[in-house]
Amino acid sequence: MLGSVKMEAHDLAEWSYYPEAGEVYSPVNPVPTMAPLNSYMTLNPLSSPYPPGGLQASPLPTGPLAPPAPTAPLGPTFPSLGTGGSTGGSASGYVAPGPGLVHGKEMAKGYRRPLAHAKPPYSYISLITMAIQQAPGKMLTLSEIYQWIMDLFPYYRENQQRWQNSIRHSLSFNDCFVKVARSPDKPGKGSYWALHPSSGNMFENGCYLRRQKRFKLEEKAKKGNSATSASRNGTAGSATSATTTAATAVTSPAQPQPTPSEPEAQSGDDVGGLDCASPPSSTPYFSGLELPGELKLDAPYNFNHPFSINNLMSEQTSTPSKLDVGFGGYGAESGEPGVYYQSLYSRSLLNAS
């Protein structure tokens, strides 16, 4: 009994001296994960905290393992890692970031000009209008306008020459500003500048950020429009008169003057003119006369042109007439109607063709 007991104890001692193969860790295999390790622990087998060597190593401890201390600082953005990461008994690898990480965006911003020194969103006309309206007498000199703008907006305290030139141009070229001479009781240098009485609706509801319309004096606009219209009318009138003169010269050529050696042609002209000028007297003569279809009377024509074909043909076929011309162009009713019929027949034939 005792021997067997001793042998069992001896066996236990041998088993404790010779560990099993599954519990021996060689330095070649990577370290398995068995407990919540720190995030800074490397898994490289060459830097394993276990001693190399083999069979004489003891079994793994059951408690948490402490990571080795970092060899180099991690950077300036993690100032709190020295205190949080040096404790070996921490079970979690999370470290709260420093105050610089929470507000890093604000720290990364560059320098910004304060709002008071920014350029105001007003035009020069708006600035001048504000300065004049804030004055007790509703008028200011040029230097007083400069001073008011610089006192209210610090942006205009720099580059004074540039924006002051713009102020002077705005005062001179805008009709909404009126130059007022100094009175004898207010001696000094420079005239006053005031707003035109009719420029009250220049801004929308008193908002100087946007101007409603450009103010212009109606008198200047009317004068400019009248001068332009007068010049246009003068040019058009001269062109019209020249055109009328040329048309008159073309449409009214010089009429030939009859010579004393042509009494027959002159009498023929008179007869043709009388015939053409008296169409109403032709109706009673031919009311009861039946004429062929080719010689029917046409509508009365008024050929008064000296070079018309009727007058030219009447000059060739005319015969000496004995008509009395004392009835004011109506023809002689008591004369012989042969010549009158002859001239009328020739005119009807020409019209029928």
From Swiss-Prot:
* Compositionally biased tracts (Pro residues): 61-73
**Where is the protein found, in the record's own terms?**
Nucleus
Ordered alphabetically, the record's keywords are: Activator, Chromatin regulator, Developmental protein, Differentiation, DNA-binding, Nucleus, Spermatogenesis, Transcription, Transcription regulation
**What changes when the gene is disrupted?**
Reduced expression levels of several HNF3 target genes (phosphoenolpyruvate carboxykinase, transferrin, tyrosine aminotransferase) by 50 to 70%,. The germinal epithelium of testes is characterized by a loss of germ cells secondary to an increase in germ cell apoptosis that ultimately leads to a Sertoli cell-only syndrome. Significantly lower blood glucose in fasted mice.
Q: Which GO terms describe its molecular function?
A: DNA binding; DNA-binding transcription factor activity, RNA polymerase II-specific; protein domain specific binding; sequence-specific DNA binding; transcription cis-regulatory region binding
Q: Name one GO biological process term.
A: cellular response to starvation
The keyword Ribonucleoprotein is assigned to this record: no
Which SMART domains does the annotation name? FH (SM00339)
The feature table lists the DNA-binding region at: 118-209
UniProt tissue specificity: Restricted mainly to endoderm-derived tissues (lung, liver, stomach, and small intestine), also present additionally in ovary, testis, heart, and adipose tissue, but missing from lung.
Main localization of the protein described in the UniProt heading: nucleus
Gene3D superfamilies for the chain: Winged helix-like DNA-binding domain superfamily/Winged helix DNA-binding domain
In its keyword annotation, does this UniProt entry include Transcription regulation?
A: yes
Region annotation Disordered: where it falls in the sequence: 52-83, 219-287
Task: Locate the compositionally biased regions of type Low complexity.
Answer: 226-254
Please provide one cellular component term from the Gene Ontology annotations of this protein.
Answer: cytosol
The annotated subunit structure for this chain is: Interacts with FOXA2.
User: What PANTHER family is this protein classified in?
Assistant: FORKHEAD BOX PROTEIN (PTHR11829), HEPATOCYTE NUCLEAR FACTOR 3-GAMMA (PTHR11829:SF201)
The job of this chain, per UniProt, is described as: Transcription factor that is thought to act as a 'pioneer' factor opening the compacted chromatin for other proteins through interactions with nucleosomal core histones and thereby replacing linker histones at target enhancer and/or promoter sites. Originally described as a transcription activator for a number of liver genes such as AFP, albumin, tyrosine aminotransferase, PEPCK, etc. Interacts with the cis-acting regulatory regions of these genes. Involved in glucose homeostasis; activates GLUT2 transcription. Involved in regulation of neuronal-specific transcription.
Q: What is this protein called?
A: Hepatocyte nuclear factor 3-gamma
- The record lists the organism as Mus musculus (Mouse)
